[in-house]
Amino acid sequence: MIDSISEETLIVKSYTVNHCAKNVPVFINSYDLTAEVAKNEDVRLARQVQISLEKIDEVIESIFSASGPSVENVKDQAKFALCRLLLGPVSIPCYCEEWDVNFYLTKCSYNCEGPVLYIYKNASQCCESTYRFSIMTNYHSTHIFRGLLSLQEWNSHLSNILCTCSNVTGDKYTATIFPNNASIYLEYYPYFLCYLCKHLSIIDIEQCTNELIAFLGPKTSQRIIIHYKLLFGFRSKPMNFTVSLLEQVFTLEIQKLYYSVSKHNSTTADFFNVITAKFAEDKYFVLRTFKLSAQITPGIQSFCSLKFKLQTLYLNLKIMKNTKLSISNSFYHGKTLYTLDEKQLVWRNLLLIYYGYNLKDNVKQTQEESLLSMHYIRILERLSLKSFREINQQFSFEIPSYQEKTLQFIPGGNDFAEITSVTHGETTVNAFNTNRVMNVKAALSGEIHCVLHRIPKSMTHSFVMYKRTFKEPSLTVSTFISNDDFTTSSLNINIRGPYCDFLYALGVYRLHVNIQDFFLPAFVCNSNNSMDLHGLENQGIVRKRKKKVYWITNFPCMISNSEKVNVGWFKAGTGIIPKVSGTDLKNVLLKELISIGEIPNITFDMDLHALLTLLEKRNMHQVPFLIKQFFMFLRLGLLVGYGRKQERKVHHIMLFLIQKGFFDFSKNSVANSKIKHACALVGSRLANNVPKILSKQKKMKLDHLGRNANALTVLRFIVENGYYKRKTIFRKLLKYLATTSFNAHVQTESNRLLNLMHNDSKTNFSSLERLYTLR
């Protein structure tokens, strides 16, 4: 009673489908399990059924979900779904007791002379499969598995519903079965095509079909072609388009275009109001223009360049000027041909409606009459046997192994990442952005018209009219203006920081100038990055590579060419990478790491390398000179005190201090001002003034040894210049480096410094003896 009441009161019938597909073999030990019921199932598939779009959407979504988690691209999922649909439906009969039936089995009885699966619950739990099975002959079936024919490679990620622990020989073909409420009929195929066309073009579908035929061979080609024709097999002819129907289509399209515009103002309101007014005045003219082919190139009658530039900005139209009159999707005004992007044909036609147009006499007669014949010829070319049999190797029929990815969200994309990390083997390098140069389009407010007389007529489009510098946030903005750009301008912005800082800088800039709107996204035309190689024991070896490096005379660094980008290497393992960002930057870093790893006798202190890279990632900034020296000598002192056997304990101590924030620092207090955006603050001359220290009445820069100088470099400078006071401490440090390092250069250099200190001690002792004798 309760069930009948619930069925009567249910207003919308639910078609919720379980998307969990399973794998069932169609060949077992040379037995074809599908042959017995193929004819009867074909009759069932071909019968007319009631069409429910909700049910069809659920079925095709379950087919999409069978692609597996490793196929993340929707287009690839659509291709795998298409391949399964081309191989077509398949059914496998079986005998099963009622208490063992689940929702993958459909009740259906056939008398089978050939093989029938007898399935029963897997009580042994030898695997995750639901059923065990045996093969019977001359018996009737009680239930049936229904799904789509597939290949073993496509179903490698799907769980088997039958236990195959015993020695069972199969075939490359298998079945992807779905729950019994996801039945597939041939009447659904044209509707499946509508769903596939959301992600695939007709050319993609044809190429995928050709590749599948070439991959599987001629034996299955007829089966694939039949299901391919069923996809395009609408029985009912589409109704003829009437004027009222075209009016509805046009109104709907205008509404879609209106909502696709990101920002509305007086410019966009005027554009759509004029289109609507002309549609009310002359519907025939507007509808004819709306369907105008891209091959026809009309001429605009009245044209306002200032208004047109604002429309292209706010409507996000991609327009180029050309001189050829044979380019599609274009219109001309005077002698200038304006070409829009091939995907913006509707916008081209709306611009023609807005400004009005005329056609040449030969264009009116020739191009419109030959339009249908051109389409017919293209269809014949596309369906020709030669192009139909072409094989495209870009699409693979093997599903990649599943790897769970956790992508880091970066506002603005990878081009605006503050840090770019690349790992090769055990070596990791962190590249930090020092500054970016971006180009942005902007619309000016109406106040610009009061200063038009100040703009000289001799200006060109590449002339910098204004250059403004801001201290907070620190950026430099160069404005390019020409004598015909009174409403728009191009901005060249030099700034450092993430995407949020860039948006904040645009807001600050807008407060000081007559900018009405910025048009994002911005184009990053140049990006400079800096990196440090941590833990490198012999830092000079990076600048001694052959074949891939060369020196320049007017700049104190070595240039290494990687991916056609000059990577500059300073002393102490510090590098700079110009021009590139995002994925290109990662490729350059990886090539450079591979090149460095091929250097013979190169040695890294991997514990120190891991600690310093972790400190960089924690602070999202390069480690300053003083903090790094304090960190390295604190660790070196602990290693000397605890001994080499307690090296892991020292590593955990330093790791604990990093995690507790003992070595955290502020980005604004970095001593090396070269990595700050100082050029925008005080100019390039004062930007090179690095803070200095006074030692023995001499001024020295804090980074005179290099920001990334290691312990051996600092000890060499102190010992050779005699800046030490407690020799015992320096001897212990040098002895530890000489005995623990695996690098021959470090051992030799440490022993040399020890001998230098020993000889210096003898010299001082002999001078004291002579002084005592004289007294």
UniProtKB/Swiss-Prot annotation:
Stored InterPro entries: Herpes_UL87_C, Herpes_UL87_N
Pfam family, one: DUF587
Signal peptide: none
Highest taxon above the source species: Viruses
Family, per entry: Belongs to the herpesviridae UL87 family.
Name of the protein in question: Protein U58
Gene: U58
